Structure formats: structure tokens, C-alpha cells
A protein has these predicted regions:
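An N-terminal assembly and electron-transfer interface module characteristic of large anaerobic redox
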Residues: 1-181
Length: 181
């Protein structure tokens, strides 16, 4: 079981600001607006520096903690953007954490996981977007997938859906083995 960490979201926000500064700088260069170029250049260094520092500290913490517990590392945000562009599934330009979820799930499939569950609060648009893109992809890749939207109600058929998913994940494991082995 792997959960995305809060650090991944924090890194994403810095990366998104870095991307916006890069885009603004490019546009300012094309329009030759020196006053705007200076501001975007400052933002580029600020957010790039923040992201570098955050990733560096995260690696240090994960290195120490992983000696004590089995902890999966987060994906590098720039790598997730590359995955989305490579697969042509979604664009970081649209924003929201859907870009993290979609690319992260593609990476987990590449790493050999035997099933994926998308757990989200009921009516969360980024997760609904993720589901709309990932469900057909997982069907095509023949990887067990379950959407689990939660609110305060009891949903009929939830237990059956979970049992079915677990059975499919077990069959996938028997057919393809454990990831990383």
C-alpha cells in the first residue's frame, strides 16, 4: 500500500509556480518586456530554489526514516509531468492535483503494482477527472482499479466492490508477481 505524501503536494505547488514563472519569462522575452522579465526571473530563482531545497530535505528525511520503516519515496514532480507528456494523457497546464494522481498511477503500473485504488472525497472534481482518465487506461493495461468516493453515507455494494477488487489484485499478483521482485 502506497499513499502520496503531503510533501508531494507541497513540491507540486512550488513546481507549478516555477512552471508559471518559466512560461512568463518566455513570453516576456518574446515581447521584449524587460520589467516583466526581471520579475519572472526572480520568481524562477525563488520557486526553483524552494523546490530544490524541499526535494533535498525530503530525500534526507526519507533516507533516515526508510532505515526504520518501509517507506515508498515520492515521485519527482518534473518526472510526473514527463510521464503525462509521454503518454499524452493530461496537461500540467490545466492545474489541480489530477496531474499528480494520473501520472502517479501510471508510474505505479510501470513499477509493477498489482492494483490501484483512487480514494477521494465525494464530488472532488480533480479526482473525478482522474477517474475519467485512469479507469479506461487501467482497463486497457489490464490492471485492477477501484474508485472509492467517500462522503458520510453508506454506499450499497461497497463491500462487494472491494472484495472484487481484492480478488482481481490477487489474480494479477499470481499472474505477474510482486512489484520490485
Amino acid at each position: 500500500v502506497v499513499n502520496a505524501s503531503v510533501a508531494e503536494w507541497i513540491n507540486y505547488t512550488s513546481y507549478d509556480r516555477y512552471r508559471l514563472a518559466k512560461t512568463g519569462l518566455r513570453l516576456s522575452l518574446k515581447q521584449f518586456r524587460l520589467d516583466r522579465m526581471k520579475g519572472y526571473l526572480e520568481d524562477l530563482f525563488r520557486y526553483g530554489g524552494d523546490l530544490f531545497y524541499q526535494e533535498h530535505k525530503q530525500r534526507q528525511v526519507y533516507k533516515r526514516v526508510s532505515a526504520l520503516i518501509d517507506l515508498a519515496g515520492d515521485h519527482k514532480i518534473s518526472h510526473l509531468e514527463d510521464v503525462l507528456m509521454e503518454e499524452d494523457l493530461y496537461s500540467f497546464d490545466l492545474g489541480t492535483e489530477a496531474c499528480l494522481s494520473i501520472a502517479g498511477m501510471v508510474e505505479y503500473v510501470r513499477e509493477g503494482y498489482n492494483g490501484l485504488v483512487n480514494v477521494y472525497p465525494f464530488t472532488c472534481m480533480p479526482s473525478i477527472t482522474t477517474s475519467a482518465i485512469v479507469r479506461p487506461l487501467m482497463n486497457r493495461l489490464r490492471v485492477p482499479y477501484l474508485d472509492a468516493a467517500y462522503d458520510s453515507s453508506t454506499q450499497p455494494g461497497r463491500e462487494a466492490a472491494i472484495r472484487t477488487f481484492m480478488y482481481q489484485a490477487d489474480q494479477h499478483f499470481k499472474r505477474y508477481g510482486r512489484h520490485g521482485s
